[in-house]
């Protein structure tokens, strides 16, 4: 009877979004291998998306990086990073200083896409790592201060409606765009 209840419950579900591991599943489907992925379902209103930040190593000087970024962003030095970023606003930590980066022209793209197209692709990063927002901004600062990296970018979390809208258009988000919580 439990199986029948579960089956009836699943039949009532309109849409299912694969939020974590969709790139792996896509690869498995293309390879024609039989797959049996573990699936855990959460209602969209019970999922929280955290920021998924970047730390980079670039051989460019801080001044050159600021010059490149200033072509598309208003740059303001800030004492501490903020807790609530808005779409189109990023934070950067470099040379013991936090900066607020506000996009000059409004853009409908995801912040992660804007970051990659307007900054990361231009500053010739030699190394990049992705840091979950679950660890807070202090982990970004610590990694830069350790000299393993010299720049950190803190992003506004992507909202769930954007994730669903992109999926509804049969499009994919860039890798490492979201950090879903809870994690299965």
Predicted regions and their residues:
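Surface-exposed, charge/polar-rich loops and edge strands
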Residues: 1-184
